[in-house]
Amino acid sequence: MEPKRRKKANTFVGIVALFALSFALMPVVWVIERVEGTPDGEVRRYLSFLAEGDAAGALAMVDPGIPNEQRLFLTNEVLTAASSRIVVESVSEPTYGDGGIDTKEVTATLRLNGDRFTHTFSLERRHKEKGDSSVWKIRDGLFVKVPVSGLRVPSFSVGGVSANAGSSDSSPVEYLFFPGVYTFQPEGLGPYVNAQATQVVVENGSHASSYETTSVSFNGQLASSLRGDVLRVAHKNLQDCATLGTNMRPSCPVELRSSAVTGIELLSSPQTLTSASDDGTYELEDAVFRYQDGSVHDLTVRVQATVIMNADGIPEVDIDGKPNITVTMQKR
């Protein structure tokens, strides 16, 4: 056989042998992967739990290793309450990580409520223990910190699970969530504070998209119904100050709190509020008294009412559920 033809024949035989070896090894590789698992297979399995609302399954694969008070919302109840959960579009083939052959990286392309984002998982090869599906373990799961604070909103709930909110933007409380679109409900408001629920989008915590929520800050507003209670309490206090016997109360003007006073009449009582502040202080129209102490005097007073708040800025109420309000009067 000529040298050229012999060379071509040898090349052909080599190629055929290579293909034959590849086909021969395929069952071996398949068996190894079945026994040991694959990095991308572990990522797919983990993401399937999150997509299906199975927080317990995801936690069984990767635990965040944090105190219980920070992981209150990593439950099936909360994850299934999400109005939208992740959809897995693709999972890449594994590539070597920084730790050499025993570390791999897998990038997943995900979609949440129409917004697409990617997340890269780091995995490492470990000894396979009983119950493990793979020798490959995800280092860090998809746990996202959400800082929560509130003005006049001491607590909040998601999916029936409640927790405390921080008192201000400078001191929020952080909680972990799995990816999803959640509704945060304000709690602990009482009858005289209004606050809106807020929609919170949790992706992967990178905040690469403006769609993802960076923090939650509730804003509780004093209810307008407080104005009616302020007028009611102010009128009651003014009538008490215009009545002999109760005119000696500390909230009454000093001019009326004299043993020389023999008669008092309330000539004018405020009908409206002139101003209101966020701290629960209200200014009312002036009131006018006429009193006698040997001679007749007209007394015009400035009327101010203050709603008593607890430490969270929530109006305190009495046994009947009415707000506690103090009224002061000063001579004009």
Regions found by a protein language model. Name each.
Residues 1-8:
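Terminal targeting segments of Actinobacterial cell-envelope proteins
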Residues 31-78, 153, 221-260:
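Core segments of small alpha/beta cavity-forming domains
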Residues 189-224, 311-312:
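Structured interaction patches on ligand/partner-binding surfaces of diverse proteins
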Residues 55-115, 249-276:
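Short solvent-exposed beta->alpha transition segments
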